[in-house]
Amino acid sequence: MSVTGPIWPPIWTEQDFADHSNVPRGTLSDFIHWYGLLRKWNARINLVAPKEIDQFWRRHAYDSWQLNAHLPKKWDRLVDLGSGGGFPGLSLGIFSKQMGAGEVYLIESIRKKASFLKTVTRELGLPITVHAARIEAVLPLEADVLTARAFAPLPRLFDYATPHLKPTSVLILPKGESADKEIKDARAHWHFDVERFKSVTDPSASILRVMNLRRKGA
């Protein structure tokens, strides 16, 4: 799996996505199917902002796909918090299907959105389990990898994530311009190591790779 360097045209087509992500034909077909379902369901429930639906291929699909480059070489269980329209959870499920990797668990408390996630999972035959529940109501999942996109600032995100982590867990977290402040705020209450990578879709954004997370005083 590979991605190219940062470029930001306003609107991408499915071919732009294919060219920059280097996905095989079958994987591209899964993304096309997902996009069709997203457009259909978005007319009834708010999965993405209407003005962003035409930006699916860069703003959502490629932005999610870039996380694959930061995953551990081997993982068995990946948990995505607040999965919404499936970014990045469904994308990671498609990647796992392609690569024969582990199981993906999506947690989404809004039942209509969870129904959408289940529909895409079923129709694409993805290795995904959808939990239609609040995060704190889900039994500990012991994730090897945990992701969340546009979900919560780091201090609160760590609170939600901790019950589902192991000492060896890795968190892969897309963040925007507030990343520096969020890291500083989180260090007031948490010990952790963090690596930061530039986003390939947004020059002001980054991908955080967090390890060895533990609460101070614990």
Language model: regions and residue ranges:
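Conserved beta-strand segments of alpha/beta enzyme cores
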Residues: 103, 127-129, 170, 191-195
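Short glycine-rich anion-binding loops that position phosphate/pyrophosphate groups of nucleotides
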Residues: 84, 150-153, 177
